[in-house]
Amino acid sequence: MTTVSMREMLQAGVHFGHQTRYWNPKMKPFIFGARNGVHIINLEHTVPMFNEALAFISNVASKKGKVLFVGTKRAASEAIKEAAVSCDQFYVDHRWLGGMLTNWKTVRQSIKRLKDLESQSVDGTFDKLTKKEALMRTRELDKLEKSLGGIKNMAGLPDVIFVIGADHEHIAIKEANNLGIPVVAVVDTNSSPDGINYIIPGNDDAMRSIRLYTGSVAAAAKAGRGQDLAVQAEQDGFVEAE
């Protein structure tokens, strides 16, 4: 089972919160104290809470569940995409479009348009268009890929969303809440933990911290998927003889 240790969190700077003047009082139970005007997060809470979240994600993946990684702020977007791709899951790394979950019917139509344009770009359709029309479709394709590329193969709503930066991604969290989709989120000292099923109190700005979260969640999803494949192989009679 994927777990993260206190040492790994300390090395990644997970315990460094925001400046004390920007704090959200709802995070008080998870704060150890302050140092040089910066809140220090109590990792005695974070370690078990994160490991519980990892176990949950692994369990979801073991049942063929879909995990949606969400992180659109600059510090998180690259790591979010890399982690989701590495475990064959889904991501939103550019901008959360309002209604991405709650208005899935419309989003699905946009995904269909994206896939149509992708086909046209490779089957020679673009070559038959005027230069101006081809340019317009290429721009539309790029725009749709940027917004929806990470969810174009999701085929339905996710079973859990994993969020870096609860404050920044409050719309995504609210949409998931409205649909009863569980939320796992990294919550810094300036954010509210409301509406989050699995709270991970921690630094949501430092690259090392972010990569620790995303890498661990990807590993948990992979491990869960591995369990699912092992069960499937056993059912299909493909178990190797010892």
UniProtKB/Swiss-Prot annotation:
- One Gene Ontology term of the molecular function aspect: structural constituent of ribosome
One GO CC annotation, please?
Answer: cytosolic small ribosomal subunit
One family name in Pfam for this protein? Ribosomal_S2
Output the PROSITE patterns linked to this UniProt entry.
RIBOSOMAL_S2_1, RIBOSOMAL_S2_2
Q: Which Gene3D superfamilies match?
A: Glucose-6-phosphate isomerase like protein, domain 1, Helix hairpin bin
Keyword Ribonucleoprotein annotated: yes
Keyword set for this entry?
Answer: Ribonucleoprotein, Ribosomal protein
Show which residues constitute the signal peptide.
none
Sorted alphabetically, which InterPro entries does this protein's record hold?
Ribosomal_uS2 (IPR001865), Ribosomal_uS2_bac/mit/plastid (IPR005706), Ribosomal_uS2_CS (IPR018130), Ribosomal_uS2_flav_dom_sf (IPR023591)
> Where are its TM segments located?
none
Could you tell me the Gene Ontology terms of the biological process aspect for this record? translation
Q: Which family does it belong to?
A: Belongs to the universal ribosomal protein uS2 family.
Recorded hits in PANTHER family, A to Z, give:
30S RIBOSOMAL PROTEIN S2 PROKARYOTIC AND ORGANELLAR, SMALL RIBOSOMAL SUBUNIT PROTEIN US2M
Q: What is this protein called?
A: Small ribosomal subunit protein uS2
What is the organism field in this record?
A: Shewanella halifaxensis (strain HAW-EB4)
In the UniProt record, the gene name given for this protein reads rpsB
